[in-house]
Amino acid sequence: MKIVMMPAKFLRLLFIFLLLSNFSASAQKTTIWIVGHAEKVTNIKQDEDPALSAAGTKRAEALAKELKGEHIKAIYVTKYKRTGLTARPLAYKAKILPRVYVDTALNVFAKTIIKNFRGENVLVIGHSNTVMKLLEAFGADVPFPSSLDEEDYDMLFKVTIKDNGKRELAIDYYGEKHHTNEIPEKYQPEINHPEAVRPFTNY
């Protein structure tokens, strides 16, 4: 039987390729996108589950456009209609079936996401009174003392989890202007990553 010997140069190149591949895989970042639901219908009874208003439907489309190139692998929503409708345009375009999470056990939820989607991008849609809790659960900074104002509809939070466990938080506006609070300067994209600044078309 004839034995074929591989040239030493080829073996060295193969070794380098495998080494770089392993390094790349181990150095992957996990990105969690967190956003509150879009504008809801307000002229209903307090105990009802409102849908999105016309402005909210437009914002849901803006969210899909904003995250179009981010390769979202999973989308999580609460049991309320307004979060599912906020996710719908992106879910449809990305061919993802949103999953429902329980927002009363956020620490467990966050640990599960980090474990199951290492190196991937995940979108989590919450509410004005849970967005800060979600950030805390994922180990990120909490930029506002307690919760978002109910009128803070246009903020998109990006939590980057590095392979060494370090977290980075960046906040951006998206869609039509609709907020009460202003993004703290230290979390603005141009402060964290000046090379990635893009014009705010709606501001």
Predicted regions mapped to residue ranges:
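Active-site-proximal alpha-helix that buttresses catalytic centers in soluble enzyme cores
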Residues: Q28-F117, V131-A137, D141-S147, D152-L156, ...
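Short helix-loop capping/hinge motifs at secondary-structure junctions, enriched
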Residues: G165-R167
